[in-house]
Amino acid sequence: MVRSVWKGPFVDGYLLGKAEKVRASGRNEVIKIWSRRSTILPQFVGLTFGVHNGNKHIPVFVSEEMVGHKFGEFAPTRTYYGHGADKKAKRK
């Protein structure tokens, strides 16, 4: 379900502060975040965020096309190993 327009995008408060600190310092460092639910804002373009996937932080470089999406969309939480091999084919 889509969020109401009048509410505006959701972003955790600490995230804006972290992004501003990195921009002010001028260093290109990974900003570790656990807030997968936060919306990517235009201020975040050009920064690299380490989005937690439940196990480790996945580095996500924010580009123009990502604005409006959620951080969690770019750090998958599940690993697909493929379906099991056919047992009949193995025996032959």
Swiss-Prot record:
Any GO molecular function: structural constituent of ribosome
GO cellular-component term (any): small ribosomal subunit
Keywords: Ribonucleoprotein, Ribosomal protein, RNA-binding, rRNA-binding
Alphabetical list of InterPro entries matching this protein: Ribosomal_uS19, Ribosomal_uS19_bac-type, Ribosomal_uS19_CS, Ribosomal_uS19_SF
PROSITE patterns in the record: RIBOSOMAL_S19 (PS00323)
GO biological process: ribosomal small subunit assembly; translation
Cysteines engaged in disulfide bonds, as pairs: none
Family stated for the protein in its record: Belongs to the universal ribosomal protein uS19 family.
Cited function: Protein S19 forms a complex with S13 that binds strongly to the 16S ribosomal RNA.
Protein name: Small ribosomal subunit protein uS19
Species per Swiss-Prot/TrEMBL record: Bartonella bacilliformis (strain ATCC 35685 / KC583 / Herrer 020/F12,63)
Encoding gene per record: rpsS1
